[in-house]
């Protein structure tokens, strides 16, 4: 049946900020859905609070709202836009929960809006653990023995039925939030309490453990005529007990017999029918008992998910696009398969003639206090995918694509005890310990016994380890063409061969080139080569025939950002996509290189050609060897491609835009100082120390407080602010190893300075300022973690003009061609330069949305040789409204981690709020970050002595807005002396009931708590902040943030919703 004509306007709900468990895969699905529905002539209205997404670009939907995804706000949008239908399956758990809220609160009924893609009942049946279990029983499928509970008493009674270890799963959450595995009574109670808090329906499933069973997923698409296809089967390398988002996964499934596969295929289709998903994609998870083959259903997601993004990239079948079209009435046989140029219908099940491996990327180095053991609660922040002709090849490519410094099975430990521990209690790099076990002489049975990983996978790794052990006894000269080719076919990188044969990577590359041994490139075509494909979606392998068929057009290659991690996320992918779009418009053929399956940049139609490859020097040079591009852009993917700039340059690659030398001048401390000196610009006093004694001596010259950091940071405990010599010595002892090669940098810390971020574009002849952002949190907090306002909300015009002048001078002095970001600190009217990055920064998408000017596109054309003047870009756009960017943090996933912000970045994502005043924009940004700000209630205040005078006006303002105040003794005494009525409450160590009790009992509406020194944070403050986080109480740990909050609460009652298109209209 063709599409529906009874609906005209469709509202798509996005996923909001990037958090653990919900990353940029939903930008990919949402962007596809917008394109698909507009193609069909529908009017598309979009709501998403995340400005760093492609889907919120003003030309993706007809009307775009960057507003909080919360049912009251969405109701205002529905009232204004009057959509006929809502598509809630493209925005992860956030969108599903919002759609259910709209239904429960009568909004859908009131405005006569229907849900398409998944009905209320289907969502509820899949997400409500109790109903799902009943539905499975009805169709004769087993689920683990389990009980639905709503109180701790019920949960404990259920536990005695299922025994330890016990699985605890909250309802209506994603990424396993709040859940876990309990091995004893104490852990059980702790996880249950956390789980009840996490579940919006206060409901848990207490489940029998199937730890050690094999885990599989099926990606299913169904249409309303009941046609079903399996897009992809996925097998988890890690057995049950590790969240699938934290598991290494392989597609297609490797260890199922054909009969088992057919049984699972039929079961997954039956699940969709019973749940009632009648249009679109779902994923169904199964577990199989390796002892006897018993199969059970674990859960299903009635929406596109992280796995469906992976399945789309693994097969080339665009699940989200197809699901969007099915939701408006099409059937699978009416849709064509794009990748084959429409030769076959979408009802053909994809078949693949290669192996895909996904490996998760973790960020535990940012959270040293976090527990890095993997359980049913997801902890990874990103992932990398690789393709090869064999599992071994794709696994080795994925490992080197992670960018964690490994290029193969690098040795972690030779201690049998340590290895046993790591095999049985998985952490982020268990696979390397599997290799170590074989290296240390463990048998296959022993490794299987401890790890429960399927023997088929273990044999593959054992074989690679034996290859490595043999290679260590040889030299590079010993290897002939046949042996080198055999190693390359198993996925060994030049770098790993060099390490094992004790030679240089360049020597291995030169030998390979002299033997004319290069990879060939194969196409991803959904049909295993059965039909021809014009789509250049390619991966490398060492075989005979190359399918790349490069053109002789003028082309530019863009290097992407690799796996998401903290500090390098979706913002950089956004810039890469924009570069590709702009250069295509300018008439170039564009080539994208990236290995992140979640992103829009790795969509097969974003660029003319896509190479799904790791971003290492070897892999990039091989693609350049085949494609011979006119130029390469390294400035848009964050640190990943930037690190390759010098080596690419040395290998004769033409880097367009800002040169490798200019990048180095900005990054090299001493060269940069000389430039600032020449321009008469100020920097905070700084010194470089090469040993501990020197550091203590130089610290006196610089003056405390200091920001200390190693000059060469490899993750790790990078930066700290130290207030005295004891803290400095402790940092030197514990955090860093200092030497001549890796000195330590000491900067004077500007206390209570205002930090300012500037993005600009320079074409060599002129500089155009993109935007000036004033940070809300004081300097010393990482710019990626601080909220910021565009335009600035309290900087004087003189200071802003001087910042503009200094920015332009530095851009010219560095010879920038393209984007540049500068961070300044302003203290008592004096401007200091903190750092300069001659590349795309993480604020580019935010500035582009706030000013209506697509900076990344403009700069890409500058890099390709088109001046700003020729593009008609002149002067700065200063909007007549305020935009505030706020950071979103993953603290709730890491019990034990303090929420205090510092110079080390820890946020995973961002949101944006827009308002006619700074206060309105700030409030909307807080709501967008899922903060609950009540209109009434008690505010708890506890600040250090230095902050007390600044607290006074805040306390008065909150009181005038109708809040009650309570404080610890010192703060209360100060406020009372100045005539503010406040109730006194005990500190944690002053007896019960204390502040933590009050927070847990729901008596506190908001907490304002600043830190003093290091010792106190460990005890009182930490307990207060942690309990506020767990009880979802709004928490401010900086006074600047508290000031902004106090000024904005008046907007709680009523704030407007503004569409991006209307805002940009005002700028003309």
From Swiss-Prot:
<feature type="binding site">
    <location>
        <position position="837"/>
    </location>
    <ligand>
        <name>Mg(2+) 4</name>
    </ligand>
</feature>
<keyword id="KW-0665">Pyrimidine biosynthesis</keyword>
<feature type="binding site">
    <location>
        <position position="823"/>
    </location>
    <ligand>
        <name>Mn(2+) 3</name>
    </ligand>
</feature>
<feature type="binding site">
    <location>
        <position position="299"/>
    </location>
    <ligand>
        <name>ATP 1</name>
    </ligand>
</feature>
<feature type="domain" description="MGS-like">
    <location>
        <begin position="931"/>
        <end position="1068"/>
    </location>
</feature>
<dbReference type="Pfam" id="PF02142">
    <property type="entry name" value="MGS"/>
</dbReference>
<dbReference type="GO" id="GO:0046872">
    <property type="term" value="F:metal ion binding"/>
</dbReference>
<dbReference type="Pfam" id="PF02786">
    <property type="entry name" value="CPSase_L_D2"/>
</dbReference>
<feature type="binding site">
    <location>
        <position position="748"/>
    </location>
    <ligand>
        <name>ATP 2</name>
    </ligand>
</feature>
<feature type="binding site">
    <location>
        <position position="835"/>
    </location>
    <ligand>
        <name>ATP 2</name>
    </ligand>
</feature>
<comment type="function">
    <text>Large subunit of the glutamine-dependent carbamoyl phosphate synthetase (CPSase). CPSase catalyzes the formation of carbamoyl phosphate from the ammonia moiety of glutamine, carbonate, and phosphate donated by ATP, constituting the first step of 2 biosynthetic pathways, one leading to arginine and/or urea and the other to pyrimidine nucleotides.</text>
</comment>
<dbReference type="GO" id="GO:0005524">
    <property type="term" value="F:ATP binding"/>
</dbReference>
<feature type="binding site">
    <location>
        <position position="169"/>
    </location>
    <ligand>
        <name>ATP 1</name>
    </ligand>
</feature>
<feature type="binding site">
    <location>
        <position position="299"/>
    </location>
    <ligand>
        <name>Mg(2+) 2</name>
    </ligand>
</feature>
<feature type="binding site">
    <location>
        <position position="823"/>
    </location>
    <ligand>
        <name>ATP 2</name>
    </ligand>
</feature>
<feature type="binding site">
    <location>
        <position position="781"/>
    </location>
    <ligand>
        <name>ATP 2</name>
    </ligand>
</feature>
<comment type="similarity">
    <text>Belongs to the CarB family.</text>
</comment>
<feature type="binding site">
    <location>
        <position position="835"/>
    </location>
    <ligand>
        <name>Mn(2+) 4</name>
    </ligand>
</feature>
<feature type="binding site">
    <location>
        <position position="243"/>
    </location>
    <ligand>
        <name>ATP 1</name>
    </ligand>
</feature>
<keyword id="KW-0547">Nucleotide-binding</keyword>
<keyword id="KW-0067">ATP-binding</keyword>
<feature type="binding site">
    <location>
        <position position="299"/>
    </location>
    <ligand>
        <name>Mn(2+) 2</name>
    </ligand>
</feature>
<feature type="binding site">
    <location>
        <position position="215"/>
    </location>
    <ligand>
        <name>ATP 1</name>
    </ligand>
</feature>
<feature type="binding site">
    <location>
        <position position="299"/>
    </location>
    <ligand>
        <name>Mg(2+) 1</name>
    </ligand>
</feature>
<feature type="region of interest" description="Allosteric domain">
    <location>
        <begin position="931"/>
        <end position="1068"/>
    </location>
</feature>
<dbReference type="GO" id="GO:0006541">
    <property type="term" value="P:glutamine metabolic process"/>
</dbReference>
<feature type="binding site">
    <location>
        <position position="823"/>
    </location>
    <ligand>
        <name>Mg(2+) 3</name>
    </ligand>
</feature>
<dbReference type="InterPro" id="IPR006275">
    <property type="entry name" value="CarbamoylP_synth_lsu"/>
</dbReference>
<feature type="binding site">
    <location>
        <position position="301"/>
    </location>
    <ligand>
        <name>Mg(2+) 2</name>
    </ligand>
</feature>
<feature type="domain" description="ATP-grasp 2">
    <location>
        <begin position="673"/>
        <end position="864"/>
    </location>
</feature>
<dbReference type="GO" id="GO:0005737">
    <property type="term" value="C:cytoplasm"/>
</dbReference>
<feature type="region of interest" description="Carboxyphosphate synthetic domain">
    <location>
        <begin position="1"/>
        <end position="403"/>
    </location>
</feature>
<dbReference type="GO" id="GO:0006526">
    <property type="term" value="P:L-arginine biosynthetic process"/>
</dbReference>
<dbReference type="Pfam" id="PF02787">
    <property type="entry name" value="CPSase_L_D3"/>
</dbReference>
<feature type="binding site">
    <location>
        <position position="835"/>
    </location>
    <ligand>
        <name>Mg(2+) 3</name>
    </ligand>
</feature>
<feature type="binding site">
    <location>
        <position position="176"/>
    </location>
    <ligand>
        <name>ATP 1</name>
    </ligand>
</feature>
<comment type="pathway">
    <text>Amino-acid biosynthesis; L-arginine biosynthesis; carbamoyl phosphate from bicarbonate: step 1/1.</text>
</comment>
<feature type="binding site">
    <location>
        <position position="129"/>
    </location>
    <ligand>
        <name>ATP 1</name>
    </ligand>
</feature>
<feature type="binding site">
    <location>
        <position position="780"/>
    </location>
    <ligand>
        <name>ATP 2</name>
    </ligand>
</feature>
<dbReference type="InterPro" id="IPR036914">
    <property type="entry name" value="MGS-like_dom_sf"/>
</dbReference>
<feature type="binding site">
    <location>
        <position position="837"/>
    </location>
    <ligand>
        <name>Mn(2+) 4</name>
    </ligand>
</feature>
<feature type="binding site">
    <location>
        <position position="709"/>
    </location>
    <ligand>
        <name>ATP 2</name>
    </ligand>
</feature>
